[in-house]
Amino acid sequence: MALWMRFLPLLALLFLWESHPTQAFVKQHLCGSHLVEALYLVCGERGFFYTPMSRREVEDPQVAQLELGGGPGAGDLQTLALEVAQQKRGIVDQCCTSICSLYQLENYCN
């Protein structure tokens, strides 16, 4: 029975996808285990890659600034580096904080 309960979210995703194939995954918030299940569904045997940021990078923006070459007197270089860092969004930013589509999930498949 534990195995059945484990696959319940995946079965729910499959049901939603089959009932409205054009709208079920147009764009959705996917977080935690739901995000992992969706990646398994989209990527299948290819698998997927995910490299989360360390807790230090998430919690301390000053550390991220220093690692990007920022700090006092960095000026335009610091601004440019922060803009580039913001453009490099991870899957959690794309799909949990914001919303994402199946096509965006496929970018994380091997």
Curated annotation (Swiss-Prot):
Residues 57-87 form a propeptide. Pfam families: Insulin. GO terms for cellular component: collagen-containing extracellular matrix; cytoplasm; cytosol; endoplasmic reticulum lumen; extracellular region; extracellular space; nucleus; secretory granule. Residues 1-24 form the signal peptide. The keyword Protein transport does not apply. GO terms for biological process: D-glucose transmembrane transport; ER overload response; glucose homeostasis; glucose metabolic process; insulin processing; insulin receptor signaling pathway; intrinsic apoptotic signaling pathway in response to endoplasmic reticulum stress; lipid catabolic process. Keywords: Carbohydrate metabolism, Cleavage on pair of basic residues, Disulfide bond, Glucose metabolism, Hormone, Secreted, Signal. It comes from the Eukaryota. Insulin decreases blood glucose concentration. It increases cell permeability to monosaccharides, amino acids and fatty acids. It accelerates glycolysis, the pentose phosphate cycle, and glycogen synthesis in liver. This is Insulin-2. The lineage of its organism: Eukaryota, Metazoa, Chordata, Craniata, Vertebrata.
